[in-house]
C-alpha cells in the first residue's frame, strides 16, 4: 500500500472511531427512537435524549413557543402526550448529515391518533445528546397521500 493510500485509510479509520465514541447510537436511530417515544407519549424517554442546555422550538399549533429549560421542555411534552394519547408515527424522508462536531437529522413525520399532527422535524445532536429540536407544524404533510 502506498503512503498516500495508507494515510487516507488511517484518516478514514480515525473518523469512524471518533464517530463511534461520540455517539452511543447513530443519530438517525436516535431520532427514530425519539419520534417513537413522542408517539407513545413516553415523556421520560423523550426528555432523557436531551443534553443539558437543549432547546425545543415548537412552531405552530397550541404549544407554539420556545422551550429552553428541561422543565419547560418536559412540561410541553407532558401537555402534548395528555392531549393526544398514543399516536402512530409515519416517518418519511429521514436524512442525516454529520461531521465530527455533531449531526442533524431531518424528517417529515405525520402523527396519527385522536388527531393528525403533521410535523417537519429537525433534530441536532452533539456528543450523542439532542441539543436542538425544531418541531414545525406542516399542514401540507397531512394532505399528502400515503406512500407504499
Which role does the model predict for each range below?
Residues 8-18:
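Bacterial N-terminal signal peptides
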Residues 42-57:
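Short, well-ordered alpha-helical segments enriched in acidic and aromatic residues
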Residues 1-9:
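Bacterial N-terminal signal peptides that target proteins for export
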Residues 55-68, 81:
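A short gly/proline-enriched turn/hairpin at secondary-structure junctions
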Residues 19-24:
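Sec/Tat signal peptide C-region and signal peptidase I cleavage site
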Residues 71-115:
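Surface-exposed, charged secondary-structure patches
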Amino acid at each position: 500500500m502506498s503512503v498516500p493510500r495508507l494515510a487516507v485509510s488511517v484518516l478514514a479509520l480515525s473518523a469512524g472511531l471518533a464517530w463511534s465514541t461520540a455517539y452511543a447510537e447513530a443519530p438517525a436511530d436516535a431520532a427514530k427512537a425519539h419520534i417513537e417515544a413522542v408517539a407513545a407519549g413516553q415523556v421520560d424517554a423523550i426528555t432523557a435524549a436531551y443534553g443539558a442546555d437543549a432547546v425545543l422550538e415548537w412552531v405552530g399549533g397550541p404549544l407554539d413557543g420556545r422551550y429552553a429549560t428541561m422543565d419547560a421542555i418536559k412540561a410541553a411534552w407532558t401537555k402534548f402526550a395528555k392531549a393526544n394519547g398514543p399516536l402512530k408515527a409515519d416517518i418519511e424522508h429521514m436524512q442525516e448529515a454529520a461531521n465530527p462536531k455533531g449531526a442533524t437529522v431531518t424528517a417529515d413525520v405525520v402523527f396519527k391518533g385522536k388527531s393528525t399532527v403533521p410535523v417537519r422535524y429537525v433534530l441536532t445532536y452533539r456528543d450523542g445528546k439532542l441539543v436542538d429540536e425544531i418541531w414545525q407544524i406542516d399542514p401540507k404533510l397531512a394532505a399528502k397521500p400515503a406512500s407504499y
